[in-house]
Structures are given as structure tokens and as C-alpha cells.
Regions:
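Short, Lys/Arg-rich, polar N-terminal cytosolic tail immediately upstream
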Residues: 1-13
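Structured, non-membrane catalytic/scaffold regions adjacent to prosthetic-group chemistry
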Residues: 45, 90, 94-95, 99-100, ...
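N-terminal signal-anchor transmembrane alpha helix
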Residues: 19-43
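N-terminal secretory signal peptides and thylakoid transit peptides that target proteins
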Residues: 196-216
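Alpha-helical transmembrane segments of multipass membrane proteins
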Residues: 27, 31, 35, 92, ...
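Extracytosolic (periplasmic/ER-lumenal) interhelical loops and adjacent juxtamembrane/interface segments
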Residues: 45-74
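N-terminal secretory signal peptides
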Residues: 105-203
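Individual transmembrane alpha-helix segments
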Residues: 69-93
Length: 555
């Protein structure tokens, strides 16, 4: 007799558990569909993106790089993170479903009530769901507060915080309602059934309805994820200016060939009319600018090269363009900075932030740009407004700019681990943010550490490449064809500007068959020779000379 009772109780418990899990999973899918629609239609950030941005600065650069290596690159790491986050959110919803199912079952047994009205949603479930949704929303708002200014359509930070909080409330509410709805469909009983009846019996019709709705939601989620993937950064993040096309090196890189790096799963798609730029902080005259305000100001054009801190010796994360915009000193003059200002903090629509010294901000070549190569900034390069800071690594040139804040030295944000910046806090650029001098071979085609095609003994070949000295210009480029023992001066065919790269050429006539080690080095505009000591790009940016092997064969 006892065995039968225990067996019945076990089956009843498992049935309650199963109903809760299924209801939670289906509600979790409904929540993800809601998040996807809000992200795609309105640019509202998902909790997944906000959590990533909140946690990222606290990861050590060593852990981040080891994760990249294990994943096989940044894009695979992003995808793994997305899959894990989606599964995690559904799992949490499933746990919520189990708690809800247990809660109702407990009330039934204590108070001896059942689903007498055969209604779709049991009103008594509100006692758990409403507080649960509110508590979850408040907790997420508190934990993610610094990142809530993110808005991928470019809303001002104050409005963005409200929208991000509302997104979580809506999504969590959908999850809570979904748990109640699917639980009711899966566990509904007739009023004639005793509360003591073993197990949880559902009608086939309502069970089918629940699963059909769940299947429709799964199809909708799949469609949303495919759409989001197509517009995501996966196809272009990490695009480098390297490979066979580099043999056609030009001084100005087309916009669609400019190197590209993004922390985002999906880059902002700013709505220009709703976008605003705030300039606040230690100023006497805070300002808010629309794009029309910025576009109406006097502009300058300048040729400037950007180089990523992840640029390795001889790699392609470096490109040159003509930027048009308003000098930052002109904007800052309008807000009247206070005498105690030491640092400028820049924030972007995607939650990115960066700082550098006020003196650098006041240099005439520091630009808030809205055009690139004669056209409006592309979405992937910061439309409608980005920062151009000659001489500093690309991470110091934030895209999708929405706020500029002037700080004094007492501001606590400047005294975080490693400094204040999205990547800076992780440990990048601990030795400084100024770009050291670089040079490389671009043509003939380079494959790894050797030229892709052999050279012909006694036949003159043209070597070409680039040299870049940050904001110091290039005064000389030298080539060695004997592993650095002797050097000859190359011709600088395109001098560029003080803040852009220079292109060089050198004619080499091989005089001996076999393998030769070619090396290039540059001297910057201040007369300083390129650092020859090799240093990996992690975490402080690469240094060292570009060595390439050449195979010389008889004709």
C-alpha cells in the first residue's frame, strides 16, 4: 500500500516537473522572439548584449585571448556566446516554469482548489509571476545600469536607459505570461476531477494547441535569428587590408575595403533624425547637438590612417581614408571647458566608451567626422558621427558617437584597473596608446612569411609596401636583402601626410639563386628609427620589423 502511494506521489511530482519545464521552455522561446523583434525593429538592446558589455571589461586580456584561440577567432567566439546565451535564457525560463508549477501544485494541495473553470490562465498564478517579473527587471537594471545607455538606433543616453529598462520589463513579462499560459494549457483539469487524482492530465486538444504555438514560436525565432545573423558583424568583423588585392595598393582605401573590427553582434543602425550628441561634464555651457547642427558647422578634410592595436607585424588591420568633419576643439570651445579638465570620455550608441587626455582632444587634427572618402559614413564605420584621433590606436577612435564628457582628475572612473576604456580596463595598451612606427611588404604577394611567387635570377622586380609613423609622418624607408646586414634606401612613391601612411617602392635585382631574407624598416618624421625588437600585439600593440623570405630561381 505504501509502495503504491509513494509511486503515485513520484509520478505526480515528475508530472508537475515536466509540465513546468515544457511551459518554461515555450515561454523562454516567446521571450526570445520578443527580444528579437524589439532589437530588429527598434534597436533596443537585448539582455545578452548588455550582459556581454557589462562583463567584458572585467575579463583579463589573457583570458580573452585564450578564449579566442580556443574558439578559433572572434567571430566563432561571438557565435558560441550567442548560442550559450540563448540556451541559458531558455534554461532560466524552464527553471521559472518549474517553480511556477510547483507553486500552483503546492497551493492546490494545501487549499484544495483545482482548475474548476477550465480557464486558460489561473488568476492565482499572478501572486508569483508579477513579483517575479518585477524583481528580475529591477535586479537586471541595477546590475546592468552602466550599459543601459546602449541603443542601436542612437537614442540619447537618458532616453536609452529608459528604453533598455522597458525592453527587459516587456521581455520578462512575456516570459512570465508565457509560463502561466502554457502551464494552463498543459495542466488543465476538469472540475469533476479530485485534487487527489494522481498525475497531471491534459486534454489532447489543449496539449496539441500548446505544442503548435510553441512550434510556431520556434519557427519565428529561427527566422529572426537568421535575419539578425545576415545583418550582423559576422561577415565583416576582422576584415583586413591584406591578401592578393593588396598588390593593387592605393593611397586611399575604398570604404568597403577599409579594415573593420567590432565588439558587437550587430552594429548600430542609427536613425539620424533621432540621434543626438551630448557634450557634458566639467563645462560651463553643456550642449546637445542634432546631426543637422553638426552638418551646418564649418568642416575640414584630412587624410588619416587608422591602425588597430591588434595589428601584427606585416598584417592588414591598417587602412587610410579621407575624413571630413568638425575639429573637436571647435566643438569643445562652445561648451567652455572648466580649468580643472584633464580627460575626455567618449561614449557610443553601442555602449562602447573610451578616454584620452584633454590635450590630445584639443589638437587641431582630432576630428568628429561625418564623411569618409567624400560620402556619409557607412553604418559599419560609425554613421552618423565618429571620432578620428591621429596617432592613437583604433580603439581610441570610437564610432557611433553619442556623448562627450569632460572629466577632472578626481573622477573615480579614471582610476579603474588599467584606466577607463572598454578595452583599456581589460588590460590593452598598458604601455600607452601611441602608435609606434610600422612598415611592411605588400607586393609581390606575401603569403605568411614568404613571397608567394619565386623571383627570377638577374631579373629586376619591384617591391612595394607601406610605412606608417602614427602622427609623426615618415621620412625614410630602407630595404635589406641580406637579413638586415646592409640597407638601401627605398623610394617613397606616395609621401602621404604627417598623420597618414606613406607608400614606398624598391627595385631589386637578385644576384644569387636560393633563399634570401628581405627586411623593411622605416624612420619617422622625427628621425626615430622603427623599433626592431619584436613584441606581440597582445596586450600593448606589436613592434618589430617585417621579415619575408624570397626564393630566387634561375630563369
Amino acid at each position: 500500500m505504501n509502495t503504491t502511494v509513494e509511486s503515485t506521489a513520484t509520478r505526480s511530482f515528475l508530472a508537475v516537473l515536466l509540465v513546468g519545464v515544457v511551459a518554461g521552455v515555450l515561454a523562454g522561446i516567446a521571450m526570445l522572439v520578443t527580444m528579437g523583434i524589439l532589437r530588429l525593429a527598434f534597436g533596443w538592446p537585448t539582455p545578452t548584449e548588455l550582459i556581454f558589455d557589462r562583463l567584458f571589461p572585467f575579463l583579463t586580456v589573457e583570458f580573452f585571448i585564450s578564449s579566442l584561440v580556443k574558439a578559433g577567432g572572434y567571430t566563432p567566439l561571438k557565435l558560441q556566446g550567442v548560442y550559450g546565451a540563448l540556451a541559458g535564457q531558455v534554461a532560466v525560463a524552464a527553471i521559472g516554469g518549474v517553480i511556477y508549477s510547483w507553486y500552483l501544485n503546492r497551493l492546490q494541495r494545501r487549499q484544495h482548489w483545482d482548475n474548476a473553470d477550465d480557464g486558460i490562465i489561473d488568476a492565482r498564478g499572478w501572486r508569483l509571476i508579477v513579483p517575479g517579473v518585477l524583481v528580475a527587471t529591477v535586479l537586471f537594471v541595477i546590475l546592468l545600469w552602466p550599459t543601459l545607455i546602449t541603443n542601436y538606433h542612437g537614442l540619447p543616453p537618458a532616453r536609452a536607459r529608459i528604453v533598455a529598462s522597458l525592453e527587459m520589463l516587456i521581455s520578462f513579462s512575456v516570459c512570465g505570461l508565457g509560463i502561466m499560459f502554457f502551464h494552463a494549457l498543459l495542466s488543465v483539469r476538469s472540475a469533476k476531477q479530485s485534487i487527489a487524482s494522481p498525475g497531471v492530465r491534459t486534454t489532447g486538444r489543449r496539449r496539441f494547441l500548446a505544442l503548435a504555438i510553441g512550434a510556431a514560436l520556434a519557427v519565428a525565432l529561427n527566422g529572426l535569428l537568421r535575419r539578425l545573423y545576415r545583418i550582423g558583424t559576422f561577415s565583416y568583423d576582422g576584415r583586413q587590408y591584406s591578401g592578393p588585392g593588396v598588390q593593387k595598393i592605393t593611397p586611399i582605401r575604398p570604404r568597403d575595403e577599409f579594415y573593420q573590427v567590432s565588439k558587437n553582434l550587430i552594429d548600430p543602425m542609427i536613425v539620424r533624425d533621432s540621434w543626438r550628441l551630448d557634450i557634458v561634464g566639467q563645462v560651463e555651457n553643456p550642449q546637445v547637438y542634432s546631426f543637422a547642427d553638426i552638418a551646418a558647422m564649418p568642416t575640414v578634410e584630412q587624410e588619416t590612417t587608422l591602425l588597430c592595436i591588434s595589428y601584427g607585424v606585416g598584417s592588414g588591420l591598417c587602412s587610410n581614408a579621407i575624413w571630413k568633419g568638425v575639429p573637436l576643439p571647435r566643438l569643445l570651445a562652445q561648451v567652455k571647458p572648466k580649468p580643472n579638465v584633464t580627460t575626455v570620455l567618449f561614449r557610443a550608441a553601442d555602449g562602447y566608451y573610451e578616454t584620452f587626455r584633454f590635450e590630445k582632444a584639443m589638437e587641431p587634427t582630432t576630428l568628429v567626422a561625418h564623411e569618409m572618402n567624400g560620402e556619409p559614413l557607412p553604418q559599419g564605420h560609425g554613421f552618423p558621427l565618429r571620432l578620428i584621433v591621429p596617432g592613437l590606436y583604433g580603439e581610441k577612435n570610437p564610432k557611433w558617437l553619442t556623448r562627450i564628457e569632460l572629466l577632472d582628475e578626481a573622477d573615480g572612473r579614471l582610476h579603474r584597473r588599467h584606466g577607463c576604456g572598454f578595452y583599456k580596463q581589460q588590460g590593452w595598451g598598458r604601455l600607452g596608446d601611441a602608435i609606434p612606427t610600422h612598415s611592411r611588404f605588400d607586393a609581390p604577394q606575401v603569403a605568411g612569411n614568404h613571397f608567394a611567387q619565386p623571383f627570377i635570377l638577374g631579373k629586376t622586380a619591384e617591391l612595394r609596401g607601406m610605412a606608417f609613423g602614427g602622427d609623426r609622418g615618415i621620412s625614410k624607408v630602407e630595404i635589406s636583402t641580406d637579413d638586415g646586414h646592409t640597407w638601401e634606401v627605398a623610394e617613397i612613391s606616395q609621401p602621404g601626410t604627417k598623420i597618414s601612411w606613406s607608400l614606398w617602392r624598391y627595385e631589386w635585382t637578385p644576384k644569387q639563386a636560393g633563399e634570401s631574407q628581405l627586411v623593411v624598416r622605416a624612420t619617422d618624421g622625427e628621425g626615430k628609427l622603427q623599433i626592431s625588437e619584436y613584441r606581440d600585439q597582445v596586450p600593448d600593440g606589436a613592434t618589430g620589423l617585417h621579415y619575408v623570405r624570397a626564393n630566387v630561381v634561375a630563369s
